[in-house]
A protein has these predicted regions:
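Structured alpha/beta or helical-core interaction and ligand-binding surfaces enriched in interleaved
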Residues: 390, 424-426, 434-441
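Charge-rich, low-aromatic oligomerization/scaffolding segments with amphipathic character
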Residues: 420-421
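Juxtacatalytic substrate-recognition/specificity segment
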Residues: 404
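Short, charged, intrinsically disordered terminal tails
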Residues: 443-449
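Inter-lobe coupling/hinge segments of SF2-like helicase ATPases
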Residues: 1-17, 21-372, 376-384, 388, ...
Length: 449
């Protein structure tokens, strides 16, 4: 708090002329702001989704418009919205045709897991294991990427089938073996992993299902016991300080094999890294999200870009059950243009952003019946307009978070429709918010959970 107070004062007094910050930096009291650079503008983390909903990237553009100064949106994998704005002339486009220092792009290939399955109980295919071995022989570094924290996303009993679920959320508890805990990644609930099943009482029959980065690290050590292995994940003991030290160690070449989540995809420079293996390239494609293909393309492009940044010959290998998926084909061929053309055409056909407008309405309450009743009453109070219609209500994919039951409505409108006015009238004509009911409105939602 003291540091924030000092920065606030120094910016307001003009003592600080350049600020590098997160979303909240937009609200500092600049007197002579003349430029905003939004780095990695495609990153969904720019959208705040609790309490006050806003997209910092869009707020930066608005602030630049109000102050009549330039705003730079930079990304190697721009969002579809930004891409369309550049194509239509709303934004100027400056293309960077090559990597820094003219470094060659990595050679990319898909490993078809139907033809090259991992060994029983493992998650690394024979071609990927062989590629790691050859990289070690050359005394170069490998990165194994899996966007899943912890050891395993699900723990169950082999005897009765009991699954460990958060008592306050509709999500499975994730085993974190390094910490000996089961953790909810939605609300933060933690509990010690028991030795016996709480349902049937059977000892030593709890099994981990699926991999997280900790489990991949265990498999790597089994294959390469002499290699220096490091796990990079945001929730490891030691916090930000430990993470910074470990990133520095990787950059200095003090690790042979790195296993990491999406934080390793964010602009880090590892000079001796020449192999990137994506353990599960299909992970994001199954999400019920209109941006699922775009997000997967961006994430995989960014993480494979960690290889060969200093000019060394490098490779990126994507383990997938869908090698013919348009996202996989675009990444392997290096043809980003075809991906964007296809994605933009599909969005336009479906009337999805940026060719249409969306608003999410999330109704939550202490009881399921209360949340559902309010959501249905809200829907009955709204009549579809000519260019706007309402979908739902339906139970949210994450139907219980922090002890609150959740239902969602989705308002979809044409690009020039007055969506905010429609939602405002819908809330005014609907039932009054009483008891434990809470209603949140998310214009242009980035998450549909």
């Amino acid at each position: 708090p003291r540091l924030r107070e000092r920065v606030w004062r120094q910016v307001g007094e003009g003592q600080v002329r350049v600020v590098a910050g997160a979303r909240s930096a937009l609200f500092l009291p600049f007197n002579e702001l003349g430029l905003i650079v939004v780095d990695e503008e495609h990153d969904p983390a720019f959208k705040q989704e609790d309490r006050v909903f806003y997209n910092a990237r869009d707020m930066a553009v608005v602030r630049g418009h109000i102050g009549n100064f330039p705003v730079i949106l930079s990304s190697a994998t721009p969002s579809v919205e930004t891409r369309v704005n550049a194509q239509t002339g709303r934004y100027a486009r400056v293309a960077l045709p090559s990597r820094y220092a003219e470094a060659a792009l990595p050679e990319l290939a898909a490993i078809d897991l139907r033809r090259h399955p991992p060994a029983r109980g493992g998650f690394l295919s024979p071609p990927l294991i062989e590629a790691i071995r050859k990289t070690l022989e050359k005394e170069e570094q490998s990165l194994l990427f899996l966007n899943r924290r912890g050891y395993a996303p699900l723990t169950l009993c082999r005897v009765c089938g009991h699954r460990f679920q958060c008592p306050d959320c509709s999500s499975w508890l994730v085993e974190h073996r390094f910490r000996g805990q089961l953790v909810c990644h939605q609300c933060g609930h933690t509990e010690k992993k028991p030795e016996a099943c709480p349902e049937c009482g059977t000892l030593d029959h709890l099994v981990a299902c699926g991999p997280g980065v900790e489990r991949i690290a265990e498999e790597v050590v089994a294959h390469f016991p002499d290699a220096r292995t490091i796990v990079l994940s945001s929730d490891l003991v030691g916090g930000v300080r430990r993470l910074r030290l470990e990133l520095e160690a990787v950059a200095k070449g003090e690790a042979d094999i790195v296993i990491g989540t999406q934080l390793v995809a964010k602009g880090h420079n590892f000079p001796n890294m020449t192999l990137v293996g994506v353990v599960d390239a299909d992970l994001g494609l199954a999400l019920a999200d209109p941006r699922a293909a775009e997000r997967t393309f961006q994430l995989l492009s960014q993480v494979t870009g960690r290889a060969g940044r200093t000019g060394k010959k490098s490779r990126g290998l994507l383990q997938t059950y869908q090698p013919d998926h348009p996202v996989m084909r675009a990444i392997v061929s290096g043809d980003a243009e075809s991906f964007y053309e296809r994605e933009i055409a599909e969005r336009e056909r479906a009337g999805l952003p940026p060719f249409g407008r969306l608003a999410g309405i999330i109704v939550s309450a202490a009881s399921r019946a209360e949340a559902e009743s309010h959501a249905r009453s809200l829907r009955r109070a709204s009549a579809d307009a000519a260019a706007i219609h309402v979908l739902g209500p339906a139970e949210a994919p994450l139907s219980l978070v922090g002890g609150r039951h959740r239902f969602r409505l989705l308002v979809q409108g044409e690009r020039k429709s007055h969506l905010q006015g429609f939602v405002r009238k819908m809330l005014a004509d609907g039932p009054k918010v009483r008891g434990s009911v809470r209603v949140a409105v998310d214009i242009d939602p980035q998450s549909f959970l």
